[in-house]
């Protein structure tokens, strides 16, 4: 404030005052980014991310730039394709708003999501890698050749956990796939047989095996998440809330009565809605708290008797997310395919017909595993 008064009294001080403000804004932005990165357990290209976000926030703080070209053209795409990153951007916008008094529109939040997408990723981004044991005769030169060739060709898609010489040794390992250069095949794990020459045909065979193994791994992980995060006592039909606030209140009450969330959860959900309403595709909503307040991670489900007015949308399905921070890395692996499924108009029409928890579970178990 003192710097701004100085500018008013001495116009020649404007350059110095703006530079002082830029430094202050940059420092605050750095602290908000630090908190966001820690909160969501991100890996980042620190220098590039900090430079991009700081520059953008400085322009907002100094009001030297308008963004008419970004008027909501990418918001829905960002929310549908990268709901995790969009939530990270909302969290960052909240921290920056509290610290700097800047108001962030949906457009500005979308721009933050773009920067985050360019220069960060979740810590568990490599969880899709397929773990493999290679069966190969005990010739060190041959083993070195195989290892180098497989790693170079498949990179982060393949995690080789061991090289063994017999199928019995491979069967004892905990892995997703066995790659065998001998006539022996594993009886315990999926197995692909290749030659030690690593020809184009061999690479094609391993590539196909990796795709199958990754899909099986994804299906098992999602099935486990469905069982873990859904609860029959938090599945509601035959209810007709009059609006979004009533629907949020109803679901928060249910979560609080089961001891899953504390009383302050409700206010955090409503705060999140003020930044960017959680209605997707004008047909379903995914309200959730700004912070990880839940004692346990659960998803409450509401299929109302009639559509609920949610901002400018009519919502026919509500999924309220109660997330515990310890579960977040696992939860986002379930969250992204769930949102993708609900954006499919055919599948969404089918899920609206569901009336029991068992039907809902079976539907998700069958369909979510096909979305990745």
List each model region and its residues.
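A cross-family "folded-core" feature that marks the main globular domain of proteins
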Residues: 1-335, 339-372
């Amino acid at each position: 404030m003192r710097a701004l008064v100085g500018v008013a009294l001495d116009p020649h001080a404007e350059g110095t005052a703006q530079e002082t403000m830029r430094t202050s804004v940059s420092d605050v932005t750095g602290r908000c980014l630090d908190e966001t990165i820690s909160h969501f357990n991100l890996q980042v290209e620190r220098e590039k991310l900090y430079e991009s976000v700081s520059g953008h926030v400085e322009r907002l703080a100094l009001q030297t730039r308008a963004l008419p070209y970004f008027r909501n053209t990418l918001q829905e795409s960002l929310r549908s394709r990268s709901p995790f990153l969009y939530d990270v951007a909302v969290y960052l916008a909240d921290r920056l708003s509290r610290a700097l008094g800047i108001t962030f529109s949906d457009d500005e939040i979308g721009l933050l999501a773009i920067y985050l997408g360019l220069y960060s990723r979740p810590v568990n981004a490599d969880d899709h890698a397929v773990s493999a044991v290679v069966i190969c005769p005990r010739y060190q030169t041959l083993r070195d050749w195989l290892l180098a060739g497989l790693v170079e060709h498949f990179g982060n898609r393949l995690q080789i956990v061991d090289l063994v010489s017999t199928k019995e040794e491979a069967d004892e390992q905990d892995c997703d796939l066995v790659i065998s250069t001998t006539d022996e095949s594993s009886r315990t794990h999926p197995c692909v047989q290749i030659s030690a020459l690593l020809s184009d045909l061999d690479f094609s065979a391993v590539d196909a095996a990796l795709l199958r193994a990754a899909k099986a791994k994804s299906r098992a992980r999602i099935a486990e998440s469905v069982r873990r995060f859904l609860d029959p006592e938090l599945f509601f039909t035959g209810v007709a809330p009059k609006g979004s606030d009533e629907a949020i209140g109803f679901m928060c009450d249910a979560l609080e009565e089961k001891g899953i969330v504390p009383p302050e959860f409700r206010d955090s959900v409503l705060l999140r809605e003020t930044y960017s309403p959680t209605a997707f595709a004008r047909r379903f909503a995914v309200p959730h708290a700004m912070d990880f307040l839940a004692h346990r991670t659960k998803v409450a489900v509401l299929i109302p008797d009639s559509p609920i007015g949610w901002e400018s949308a009519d919502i026919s399905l509500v999924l309220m997310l109660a997330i515990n921070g310890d579960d977040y890395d696992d939860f986002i692996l379930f969250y992204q395919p769930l949102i993708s499924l609900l954006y499919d108009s055919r599948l969404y029409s089918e899920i609206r017909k569901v009336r029991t928890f068992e039907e809902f579970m079976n539907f998700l178990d069958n369909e979510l595993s096909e979305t990745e």
